[in-house]
C-alpha cells in the first residue's frame, strides 16, 4: 500500500470514532501473540510489539492485562489467523488478514462485503506472489542521524528505512521481526505500531474517483470485527 494512501486512510480513521472497534482488535492481537509465544513480553517479541501498539493507541492497561490473562485461561477461545485475497473495483488487489474463533462466520462475512461492494474473493495464493511479507515498524519521527541508525540496524535484518513528515518506517524480512524488534527497543525509539504486513511489489495509481469506489469496500472490511488488517496494491 502506498504511503500517500496510508496517510489518507489514517487521517480518515482519525476523524471517525473507531475506538469501540479498535480496542477489541488490539486485544485480540495481544491474546493471540500471548497464546502463541507465551505471556512474558520480555521473551515474546510479537507480544511486546502488540502491547506497544495498544499503548500507542491509548488502550488502558487493564484491557491489555485482561487480554494476556485470557490467553492462558482454560476457556480461552481458539482464535485462528486467516487471510483472504480478492479484487476491489477497478482491479485493485486486496489481502485481508483476520483473527477469528469462527472461520465459517468470517469467510461468509468477508465474501458478502466483497460481493456487495463491487469486489470479488479470489482463491488463496492468487495474489500473494504480488506482495512481499515484511516486518514493518511504524515509529515516531527520529531526530538523530538516520544513516547511523540504518547502519546500526542492518545486522538485525533491516532492509529499508524511510522517514517523512509523519513517521519513521523500518522494514525487514518477516523472519527478522524478533531481531529488529529487540534492536529498535535498545535504540529507545518510540513505537506507534508494528507487525507483519503485505507490501505490494508493484503499487498501482488510481484516480480520485476510482479511490472513492475502492474505499467503500475497504471501509466495510475494516469495520468487520474479525478483520485485523487490509493491504492493497494502491500507490
From Swiss-Prot:
Chief location category: cytoplasm
Keywords: Cytoplasm, DNA-binding, Transcription, Transcription regulation
One Pfam family per UniProt: TACO1_YebC_N
Superkingdom assignment: Bacteria
One Gene Ontology cellular component annotation held by this UniProt entry: cytosol
Subcellular location: Cytoplasm
SUPFAM superfamilies, A to Z: YebC-like
Recorded GO MF terms: DNA binding
A GO BP entry: regulation of DNA-templated transcription
Sequence similarity: Belongs to the TACO1 family.
Family annotation (PANTHER family): TRANSCRIPTIONAL REGULATORY PROTEIN YEBC-RELATED, TRANSLATIONAL ACTIVATOR OF CYTOCHROME C OXIDASE 1
Name under which the protein is recorded: Probable transcriptional regulatory protein Cla_1081
Provenance organism: Campylobacter lari (strain RM2100 / D67 / ATCC BAA-1060)
Amino acid at each position: 500500500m502506498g504511503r500517500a494512501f496510508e496517510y489518507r486512510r489514517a487521517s480518515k480513521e482519525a476523524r471517525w470514532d473507531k475506538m469501540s472497534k479498535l480496542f477489541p482488535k488490539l486485544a485480540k492481537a495481544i491474546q493471540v501473540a500471548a497464546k502463541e509465544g507465551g505471556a512474558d513480553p520480555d521473551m515474546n517479541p510479537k507480544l511486546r510489539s502488540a502491547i506497544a501498539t495498544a499503548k500507542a493507541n491509548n488502550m488502558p492497561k487493564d484491557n491489555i492485562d485482561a487480554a494476556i490473562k485470557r490467553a492462558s485461561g482454560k476457556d480461552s477461545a481458539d482464535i485462528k489467523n486467516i487471510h483472504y485475497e480478492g479484487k476491489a473495483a477497478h482491479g485493485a488487489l486486496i489481502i485481508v488478514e483476520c483473527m477469528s474463533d469462527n472461520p465459517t462466520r468470517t469467510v461468509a462475512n468477508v465474501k458478502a462485503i466483497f460481493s456487495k461492494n463491487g469486489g470479488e474473493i479470489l482463491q488463496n495464493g492468487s495474489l500473494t506472489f504480488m506482495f512481499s511479507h515484511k516486518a514493518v515498524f511504524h515509529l515516531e519521527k527520529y531526530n538523530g542521524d538516520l544513516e547511523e541508525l540504518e547502519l546500526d540496524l542492518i545486522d538485525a535484518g533491516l532492509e529499508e528505512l524511510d522517514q517523512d513528515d509523519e513517521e519513521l518506517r523500518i522494514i525487514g524480512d518477516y523472519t527478522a521481526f524478533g531481531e529488529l524488534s529487540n534492536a529498535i527497543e535498545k535504540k529507545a525509539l518510540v513505537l506507534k505500531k508494528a507487525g507483519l504486513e503485505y507490501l505490494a511489489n508493484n503499487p498501482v495509481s488510481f484516480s480520485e474517483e476510482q479511490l472513492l469506489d475502492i474505499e467503500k469496500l475497504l471501509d466495510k472490511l475494516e469495520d468487520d470485527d474479525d478483520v485485523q488488517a487490509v493491504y492493497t496494491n494502491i500507490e
